[in-house]
């Protein structure tokens, strides 16, 4: 399994089982609110981005009431600060590239906190465009391994634009060009297969291997970013090994 697919699978399992569900659901609620505002409709049948975020929410067992509240907030019901999306680019120890995607109601506060995490952990915040050229946005869909086979899934998703399928013990990870996300999910649902997760993810064109000590420092920074309330996603070009995941 590739480093990216391995890491995506680990993060998916963590989201499904993490004891800190409240923080995960809070982040997804922001994504739902933004999806409604940007997609222009609270109806997932008319809003592809919202439809995909709801798939992600259900994959973490987010209660329907929480999902509905976030949709209403995005549609203008209730109070709530304006949430903005932005990205920060930088370097971690060993020259590893990192992109941090955030959804925040206070970009000055968030920028200062992101900069602090970089600087206090051997990294540095860079200007926009410094590392983003090393990544492409991809559709990544997770399917339960139980009851499915690689061959049967290939027959379903290749015509929908998927490029690759990889498997670990519990899930199949399907990847394809960013614009194929909805078509892959729709093709699976048409065959009665419910994805556990479906989202657009930044994937590095090439990964890099560095000294294990530096790699552990990079994993620490990634963990700090992922624990930040405003961070929605973290991408890196570090080659994620089994040893690092087990740490």
From Swiss-Prot:
Stored InterPro entries: Integrase-like_N (IPR017856), TACO1_YebC-like_2nd/3rd_dom (IPR048300), TACO1_YebC_N (IPR049083), Transcrip_reg_TACO1-like (IPR002876), Transcrip_reg_TACO1-like_dom3 (IPR026564), YebC-like (IPR029072)
Swiss-Prot/TrEMBL GO biological process terms: regulation of DNA-templated transcription
Cellular location(s): Cytoplasm
Organism superkingdom: Bacteria
UniProt keyword terms in alphabetical order: Cytoplasm, DNA-binding, Transcription, Transcription regulation
UniProt-listed Pfam families: TACO1_YebC_N (PF20772), Transcrip_reg (PF01709)
GO cellular component, one term: cytosol
Renumbered residue ranges of the record's region Disordered: 1-22
TM helices/strands, residue ranges: none
MF annotations from Gene Ontology: DNA binding
Main location class: cytoplasm
Signal peptide boundaries: none
Coiled coil (UniProt feature): none
PANTHER family hit by this protein: TRANSCRIPTIONAL REGULATORY PROTEIN YEBC-RELATED (PTHR12532:SF6), TRANSLATIONAL ACTIVATOR OF CYTOCHROME C OXIDASE 1 (PTHR12532)
Alphabetized HAMAP family for the sequence: Transcrip_reg_TACO1
Similarity field: Belongs to the TACO1 family.
Name assigned to this protein: Probable transcriptional regulatory protein BHWA1_01533
Organism, as annotated: Brachyspira hyodysenteriae (strain ATCC 49526 / WA1)
């Amino acid at each position: 399994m590739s480093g990216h697919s391995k890491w995506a699978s680990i993060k998916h399992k963590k989201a499904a089982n993490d004891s800190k569900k409240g923080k995960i659901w809070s982040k997804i609620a922001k994504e739902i609110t933004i999806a409604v505002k940007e997609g222009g409709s609270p109806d997932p049948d008319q809003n592809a981005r919202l439809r995909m975020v709801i798939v992600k929410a259900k994959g973490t067992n987010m209660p329907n009431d929480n999902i509905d509240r976030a949709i209403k907030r995005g549609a203008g019901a209730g109070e709530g600060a304006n949430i903005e999306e932005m990205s920060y680019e930088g370097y971690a120890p060993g020259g590893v590239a990192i992109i941090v995607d955030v959804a925040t109601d206070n970009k000055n506060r968030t920028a200062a906190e992101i900069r602090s995490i970089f600087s206090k952990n051997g990294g540095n915040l860079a200007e926009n465009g410094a590392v983003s050229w090393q990544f492409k946005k991809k559709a990544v869909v997770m399917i339960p391994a139980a009851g499915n086979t690689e061959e049967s899934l290939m027959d379903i998703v290749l015509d929908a634009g998927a490029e690759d399928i990889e498997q670990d013990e519990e899930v199949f990870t399907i990847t394809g060009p960013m614009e194929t996300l909805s078509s892959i999910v729709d093709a699976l649902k048409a065959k009665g297969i419910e994805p556990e997760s479906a989202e657009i993810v930044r994937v590095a064109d090439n990964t890099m291997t560095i000294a294990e000590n530096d790699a552990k420092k990079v994993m620490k920074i990634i963990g700090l970013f992922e624990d930040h309330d405003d961070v929605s996603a973290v991408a890196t070009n570090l080659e994620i090994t089994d040893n690092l995941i087990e740490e």
